[in-house]
Each structure stands twice: as structure tokens, then as C-alpha cells.
Amino acid sequence: MHSNSAGFLQFIKTTKSFDTFFKILIKQIGREGTLVVPTYNYNFTKGCAFDKSKSISQVGAFTNYLIKKYNQNRTNDPIFSHLIFGKLYRKLNNCKNEEVFGRKSIFAHFEKYNFQIVCFCCPPNKMTFLHYIEKKTNVKYRFNKIFNGKIKIKNKYKVIKVKYYVGKRNINYTIRGNNLLKLINKRKFREESFGRFLCYTVRTKYLANIVRKELSKNQYFLIK
């Protein structure tokens, strides 16, 4: 679930809104469901060690609020870590992190289990799962790059190598929302309003299928 903290704060201007929203989410997924919240930190790519209890999330205040309360639920992926709650915690927590968008990565499991992606008060181009689709399609504007670094596990530092599908410097590889918005429909890729913001939801398998189809016709569908 991707989120924009301004969506919570438009009604309750304190972190109480974070706690209320989280409790609603947990109740909504029930015992058989799983909630995954991105807690990404890109400092590993700049030579910094990753510590899941201390490395802050760089993707929003809500995610850092949850890290402070539930850091034990955070994965050890040094770049694209997630907080995981629910039935699939063990399976997702044990995913391989040597290749960010690889066949054994957490993103591959999102597709396998057909997760529902929710963009709460943020645009659909924020979905990191789109980079996984880019990887599977082998788009021309990205390439595999190896990053060496350390992660802290049980008070000990471990040296690891991570393969990350990064964008080429000579092109603006930022995902744009224009073409994605054209894929929205009332059934499988939905748009709903929440106060003054828009929210989006789509299943991973459906998103992967329609975006791959578009990329097969135009490699630059997501960025131009």
C-alpha cells in the first residue's frame, strides 16, 4: 500500500490519524489477509549500511510512524524494505533480496499471490511494482547494476551484493502518470476520491498483463 500522509492529515492533523487508519486496515484484511507497507531507503546505493530498526523510511511520515512501533515486522531488504502484517508474513519476509526485482523477490510474490495494490491519496505512477514489470519486460532504458554494502542483522553486520535494475543516466526514466491513467476502468483498475485526493486500486496480475501488453507495443509507454 502506497500512501500520502496529507490524505490522513486533511481531516485529523495529528498522528492519531495514522493509528486510526492502520487499525482500520488491519481489521479490513482480517486473519486471512496480508498488509504490506513500503519503507524504502535508498542510502544503501550511496554506501550506507542498512539497519531495519534505525534506517528511516524515505517514502512518508506514515511509514516512519509504523517503523517506530513495528520495526520487527520490517524486512531486511536494504533498498526496498517493507513492513509486513498478516498471514503471508513468513513467506514474504524470507524472500531473496539479492536481486531487487528478480524472480525470487518480494515483488515476484506480489504477482504470484495477486496482491491488491492501493495508492492511498497518491498517483498510480508511485507503484513500485511497475519497476518489476519493467524488469520482466527488459525495457531499454534500464540495466542491472551491482551494489555492495552491509546490512545489520542481530547486532552483526553482513556484507551483501544487491542487483538493482536502475535507469540509464542519459534518459529521464521517471514513470509518468498520463498513460497509466488511460488504463483506468470502473472494474479492475479503479479510481476513487477521498476528500480532496484521489486513490487508486488494482490487482498485480491485471496490472502486469495490461502494462506488459502496452510495453510490447511501445518500450517507453511508462516514461513518455
Label every PLM stretch briefly.
Residues 2-224:
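N-terminal and secondary-structure boundary signal
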